[in-house]
């Protein structure tokens, strides 16, 4: 928001300079983005009157004038401005004046005619970019008065960033309140006496959507001169706030908007059919806006309509049909309070952002409408003339926001600020902020002012007290904390340790959104129910993820589209699963997931290009699982997952509980997601693994190890992992290592069977094993395999 410093000082004028004022506003939480002078540096420019204006004898586009600047004689000045005319009050740079850019005015001759000064435009004085003509001053401007003094050009524009919670500061009065509070200075409330109705004309107003529009005020003003010029003082105030003057009626509503922060609108009363109806739009209803664009409305959009059609989008933009134009004689002034939720998002939907929508979305003072409509009526009558009717008030007190009553405890105040502020100061600060305060025993009950709807809870009052007291006035205190040794369980496995291992294996950690595309998620988890967001960032981010795969696979596609074909990434994060037994109906599980694709190794002259396969990912995952000490209890079982290849995937079980999946992405899913080549994924429920088994130290055997190899033939559907597990179980005291080193299918092995070559490492910690003992242990393993898997030794 941009405003004039002098306009602010009309409301409150603390005895501090511009720099101190800007710093004070920033420290109050309204960050000042810039302070700029409203005009360039110049002197010697005074008010003059064009007494004579004749055509230059030697130039078609020049005029020869005689100008009275209040001196002993008239000045001869040559001027080329098209609006120069006799009787016009102008800004005259006399001989010796210095204009912006260090341009000194001297006596000269232009096409043979003497010129003793310059009739200035706004651009020549560095006031604005308007160079279309010379400045036209009011007829009552006193001759010879310094133009800087007359136009009050020793002023600055201050631009501030207003945070969403401080919508009350989107008007001069709101900033003035804060400055008054900070300086303990009086706020000069402007006289806004009610305008007495001189006519009885009204217009029927019906509010059908009372929740969206709790208060709607209207007032008929008849017989106005819409072509009356806007006073220069008002134009200047608007300009210094970044608002262009349009016509007197629009300028008045903009002036009230900037001064009080209350948006207003003026309708051409004669174009309203029947009366005003505040209602929700009909689905697909259209309205042509003031800028000529056509908006197609949704049923959740609030509109101002007459008895037959929509006239404008409430709180956002007026309509062209009922807009004020050069022929307007009678207007209806509108001043309303709209519920912020009924306005939020509607402007963006139509590609609009107006000063009105900016304020209504954040909220305006629900008690301000009477003051604003009286102020606008008085200004309109003073400028355009006419007669005003009575105020038409349609209010629903039940739906208007209520003032919050908040209890501030001394203990909470001291604890959060870390400094004791005297009771009298606290009470004084709250009252200066506009609160109605009742003092109690070590507490205050404060009723928030109507313009501060951001005051809702105790912490809000703590913030306000600290802000007004001054953050710089709170002494620095060194932080004191007791050094309490935290407890550490040996069984706790840090997720950071797992991440470090994956980093060491060439994986990169990524963080993806918890919001995913529901269509993509349905491809990965067909038929699964997901939590849908009522107000998503976009349609593609409207569902909460059921697994980390949605984000990871999208990341793979993103990288592949940028010629990064070798990808190794992992992520840890929450998934959100609807569960009626969980708190709030949503179960949140911490997951660990990873994806690999592309070549096994980076390109190298001494390495063959080999694409990653199931066992690459399984090996990396087993290394992670080994950190938990539970690898021996992990089983990979063939189990269907719609997102994975049925022949190259497995469910991961910890004892008898499934904790995740691993496998190659299903070819059909791969095609639909535009994945380039084989992609492998895994996902685990981390909390099932975080409590690791503490390793038990044991003596390393000093005796020699013995290796024996066996080849067993088993059915094709028997997992090799089960064979190895059985061998370990049978030879628990002596078999210290079991390894599968070959798988054979073909000649000598029947169809539907496979030959597994297994090495058994046997060793004892107390003695050297005899050959008979070794043979007996191997025989026990073979016998166990025959009994459980119908295995046979291969010849």
UniProtKB/Swiss-Prot annotation:
SUPFAM superfamilies: Anticodon-binding domain of PheRS (SSF54991), Class II aaRS and biotin synthetases (SSF55681), Nucleic acid-binding proteins (SSF50249), PheT/TilS domain (SSF56037), Putative DNA-binding domain (SSF46955)
Main localization (coarse): cytoplasm
GO biological process, one term: phenylalanyl-tRNA aminoacylation
Lineage: Bacteria, Pseudomonadati, Pseudomonadota, Gammaproteobacteria, Enterobacterales
UniProt protein name: Phenylalanine--tRNA ligase beta subunit
Cofactors (names): Mg(2+)
Family: Belongs to the phenylalanyl-tRNA synthetase beta subunit family. Type 1 subfamily.
Domain tRNA-binding: 39-148
């Amino acid at each position: 928001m941009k405003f004039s410093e002098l306009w602010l000082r009309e409301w409150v004028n603390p005895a501090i300079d511009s720099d101190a004022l800007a710093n004070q506003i920033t420290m109050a939480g309204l960050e000042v983005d810039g302070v700029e002078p409203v005009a360039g540096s110049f002197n010697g420019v005074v008010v003059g009157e064009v007494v004579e204006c004749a055509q230059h004898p030697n130039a078609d586009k020049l005029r020869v004038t005689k100008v009275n600047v209040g001196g002993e004689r008239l000045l001869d000045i040559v001027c080329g401005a098209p609006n120069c005319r006799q009787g016009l009050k102008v800004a005259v740079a006399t001989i010796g004046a210095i204009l912006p850019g260090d341009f000194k005015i001297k006596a000269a001759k232009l096409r043979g005619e003497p010129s003793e000064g310059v009739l200035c435009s706004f651009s020549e004085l560095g006031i604005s970019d308007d160079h279309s003509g010379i400045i036209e001053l009011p007829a009552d401007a006193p001759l010879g008065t310094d133009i800087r003094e007359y136009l009050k050009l020793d002023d600055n524009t201050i631009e501030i960033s207003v945070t969403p919670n401080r919508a009350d500061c989107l008007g001069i009065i709101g900033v003035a309140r804060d400055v008054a509070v900070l300086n303990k200075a009086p706020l000069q409330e402007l006289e806004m006496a009610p305008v007495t109705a001189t006519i009885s004309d009204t217009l029927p107003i019906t509010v059908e959507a009372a929740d969206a529009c709790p208060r709607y005020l209207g007032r008929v003003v008849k017989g106005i001169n819409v072509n009356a010029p806007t006073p220069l003082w008002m134009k200047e105030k608007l300009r210094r706030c970044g608002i262009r003057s349009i016509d007197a009626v629009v300028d008045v509503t903009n002036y009230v908007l900037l001064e009080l922060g209350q948006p207003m609108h003026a309708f051409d009363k004669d174009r309203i059919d029947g009366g005003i109806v505040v209602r929700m739009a009909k689905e697909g209803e259209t309205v042509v806006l003031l800028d000529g664009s056509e908006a197609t409305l949704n049923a959740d959009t609030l509109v101002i309509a007459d008895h037959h059609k929509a006239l404008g989008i409430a709180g956002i933009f007026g309509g062209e049909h009922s807009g004020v134009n050069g022929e307007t004689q009678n207007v209806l002034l509108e001043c309303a309070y709209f519920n912020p939720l009924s306005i939020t998002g509607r402007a963006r939907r139509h590609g609009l952002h107006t000063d009105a929508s900016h304020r209504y979305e954040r909220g305006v003072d629900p008690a301000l409408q009477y003051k604003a409509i009286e102020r606008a009526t008085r200004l309109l009558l003073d400028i355009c003339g006419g007669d005003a009717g009575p105020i038409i008030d349609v209010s629903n007190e039940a739906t208007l926001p209520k003032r919050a009553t908040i209890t501030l405890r001394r203990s909470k105040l001291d604890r959060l600020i870390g400094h004791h502020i005297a009771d009298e100061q606290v009470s004084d600060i709250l009252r200066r902020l506009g609160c109605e305060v009742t003092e109690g025993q070590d507490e205050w009950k404060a009723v928030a002012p109507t313009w501060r709807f951001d005051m809702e809870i105790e912490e809000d009052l703590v913030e306000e007290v600290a802000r007004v007291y001054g953050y710089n006035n709170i002494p620095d205190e060194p932080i004191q904390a007791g050094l309490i040794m935290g407890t550490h369980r040996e069984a706790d496995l840090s997720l950071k340790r797992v991440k470090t291992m994956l980093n060491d294996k060439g994986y990169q950690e990524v963080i993806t959104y918890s919001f995913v595309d529901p269509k993509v998620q349905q491809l990965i988890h067909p038929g699964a129910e997901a939590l849908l967001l009522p107000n998503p960032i976009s349609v593609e981010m409207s569902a909460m993820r059921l697994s980390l795969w949605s984000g990871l696979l999208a990341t793979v596609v993103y990288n592949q589209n940028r010629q990064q074909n070798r990808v190794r990434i992992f992520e840890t994060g929450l998934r959100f699963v609807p569960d009626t037994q969980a708190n709030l109906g949503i179960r949140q599980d911490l997951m660990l997931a990873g994806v690999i694709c592309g070549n096994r190794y980076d390109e190298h002259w001494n390495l063959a290009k080999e694409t990653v396969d199931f066992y690459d990912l399984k090996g990396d995952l087993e290394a992670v699982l080994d950190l938990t000490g539970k690898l021996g209890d992990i089983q990979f079982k063939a189990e269907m997952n719609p997102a994975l290849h049925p022949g190259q995937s497995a469910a991961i079980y910890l004892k008898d509980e499934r904790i995740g999946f691993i496998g190659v992405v299903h070819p059909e899913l791969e095609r639909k997601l535009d994945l380039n080549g084989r992609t492998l994924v895994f996902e685990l429920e981390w909390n099932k693994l975080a409590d690791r088994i503490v390793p038990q130290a044991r003596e390393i055997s000093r005796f020699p190890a013995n290796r024996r190899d066996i080849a067993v033939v088993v059915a094709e559907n028997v997992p090799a992992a089960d064979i190895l597990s059985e061998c370990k179980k049978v030879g628990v005291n002596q078999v210290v290592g079991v390894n599968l080193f070959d798988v054979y299918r073909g000649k000598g092995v029947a169809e539907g069977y496979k030959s597994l070559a297994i090495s058994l490492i046997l060793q004892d910690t107390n003695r050297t094993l005899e050959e008979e003992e070794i043979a007996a242990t191997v025989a026990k393993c073979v016998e166990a395999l025959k009994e459980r898997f119908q295995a046979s030794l291969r010849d």
